[in-house]
Amino acid sequence: MAVKTLQDLLNEGVEGRGVLVRSDLNVPLDDNGQITDPGRIIASIPTLKALVEAGAKVVVTAHLGRPKGEPDPKFSLAPVAAKLAELLGRNVQLAGDVVGYDALSRSEGLTDGDVLLLENVRFDPRETSKDEAERGKLAAALVELVGEDGAFVSDGFGVVHRKQASVYDVAKLLPHYAGTLVAAEVDVLAKLTDNTERPYAVVLGGSKVSDKLAVIEALAPKVDTLVIGGGMCFTFLAAQGLSVGSSLLQEEMIDTCKGLLERYADVIHLPRDVVVADSFSADAESKCVPANEIPDGWMGLDIGAESVDRFAALLTEAKTVFWNGPMGVFEFEKFAAGTRGVAEAIVAATGKGAFTVVGGGDSAAAVRALGLPEDGFSHISTGGGASLEYLEGKELPGISVLEDTAPEGS
């Protein structure tokens, strides 16, 4: 990645300068507004801490959830500000708006080493606008908060696949740098696409084939093993002519799955047994059945023990592993064994020297929810969608804009 990094900025000197940081602080909250998984906040700390210690006036912009372009208290970054302050060991101011009077007045009052978190950037409809001029106006307002001699650090890998004001347009207006997290993420993903050590195994789960089709098409010709579990496996099983009962099924994708199974018969591995339930609930009646014996009215919610053993045998022999998507409904204890078993096999592969990557999103959440050791994987990505789009070979706007060395008008 031919871009300037945070270290380049620190070498240039940031004491007394305003630095705008786009972090990914989009963490899950419970019904009481409490953070249930602070993983992304924790991942943002190294960049912020380095800037604080170097004496920068740090202004952080980020989003939470999907507000509809206007302020919504349930999507406020207030709990995030409190967690940031705890992890940084210093006060973090929270602006009452995105780029309004409060944000501007607080930014003008910053002293060296201070941190200001702007309110949820998606409270401003211009952030996600398709109109470049509208996004540009918000970007210009963000720049005003750090001044013309300021800098922009892109450290939110989970959003680099979005062409949004705080991710893309602002980088055109300021000297720009990849933060510690973004630089590390891209370096890791490059290892999954360039001169990858074999055997190379990919594990894909999740609910919909349509969500993973592009990455299957991109990776199937390049890998030795492609394990498919989760809700999406039932569309593949249906493509083999099997009855899947009331399991999740994308009928419009059956022919596509047939084609994939024909082309990559030696690469794609499907479950041979599944755990089925009579309803979608934590206390449903459940049983393990062969994949070709799913009863009518029952739905598959996890892969079975035989499948876990088969997949584990493949994964523990791999030298490179990429995992994206759970094997079942791991949030329900009855249907967590498949995800746990596959994850433990990947940890075992890591222990044998394999390079293993968890592709963000639900997979990263599963690692934490199931109490698995995070250091049992070579890397846990903070960006599920961005990881997939990178592996699909798509351009990531928030990365490509960093490769332009000079801001507009300089």
Curated annotation (Swiss-Prot):
Pathway: Carbohydrate degradation; glycolysis; pyruvate from D-glyceraldehyde 3-phosphate: step 2/5. GO terms for cellular component: cytosol. It is found in: Cytoplasm. ATP binds at residues 212, 300, 331, 360-363. Keywords: ATP-binding, Cytoplasm, Glycolysis, Kinase, Nucleotide-binding, Transferase. GO terms for biological process: gluconeogenesis; glycolytic process. It holds the Pfam family PGK. Substrate binds at residues 24-26, 40, 63-66, 122, 162. InterPro entries: Phosphoglycerate_kinase (IPR001576), Phosphoglycerate_kinase_CS (IPR015911), Phosphoglycerate_kinase_N (IPR015824), Phosphoglycerate_kinase_sf (IPR036043). Its main location: cytoplasm. It catalyses: (2R)-3-phosphoglycerate + ATP = (2R)-3-phospho-glyceroyl phosphate + ADP. GO terms for molecular function: ADP binding; ATP binding; phosphoglycerate kinase activity. Its EC number is 2.7.2.3. Monomer. Belongs to the phosphoglycerate kinase family. HAMAP family: Phosphoglyc_kinase (MF_00145). This is Phosphoglycerate kinase. The lineage of its organism: Bacteria, Bacillati, Actinomycetota, Actinomycetes, Mycobacteriales.
